[in-house]
Regions:
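Conserved Radical SAM active-site core
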Residues: 90-94, 100-108, 112-156
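Flexible, acidic/Gly-rich N-terminal and inter-domain linker regions that tether
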Residues: 1-103
Length: 156
């Protein structure tokens, strides 16, 4: 069975999951603090969690399910395209658009497209599947991490 993403779990459900495995409920808040406030997606870097808990998290939850395959600045230097590989090896793109005072992310919500427009590559092979909410969210999350390295953040 594929692992679930941390981004699919509400805090209360993570508390219940951890408690049922013998961990303290407050550990869920620590995990959420690492993931959503400190923007850490590597379980090993969550140093205030025990090694045992980090091992449990690695075995049972994905901290990230998108793998960045490519990032390309377009000629206008105001647009960056990201190519992501999903856990089923399908590929999707996201676009970061720089504009005056804004950092806007355009996300994919599907693999492929049913429209098959002649001018668009997305529909050439038809619609493969809809993305999960976690896969859609993680596109924004990952691009925000990319921007944070540059002392910026997503605004739209």
């Amino acid at each position: 069975m594929p692992l679930s993403s941390i981004h699919t779990l509400p805090l209360e459900k993570l508390r219940n999951n951890l408690s049922s495995e013998g961990y303290k409920a407050f550990h869920a808040s620590q995990v959420f603090n690492w993931v959503y406030k400190l923007r850490q997606s590597n379980w090993d870097q969550m140093t205030n969690l025990s090694l045992d808990l980090r091992s449990y998290l690695k075995e049972n939850l994905l901290a990230t399910q998108l793998v960045k395959k490519r990032e390309v600045f377009l000629e206008d230097q105001e647009t960056v395209k990201f190519l992501w590989q999903l856990s089923d090896n399908m590929l999707v793109e996201s676009v970061l658009i720089y504009s005056e005072g804004r950092r806007t992310v355009c996300v994919s919500s599907q693999v492929g497209c049913p429209a098959r427009c002649a001018f668009c590559a997305s529909g050439k092979n038809g619609l493969k599947r809809n993305l999960t909410a976690a896969e859609i969210f993680e596109q924004v999350y990952q691009i925000d991490l990319w921007l944070l390295e540059r002392k910026e953040k997503v605004s739209h």
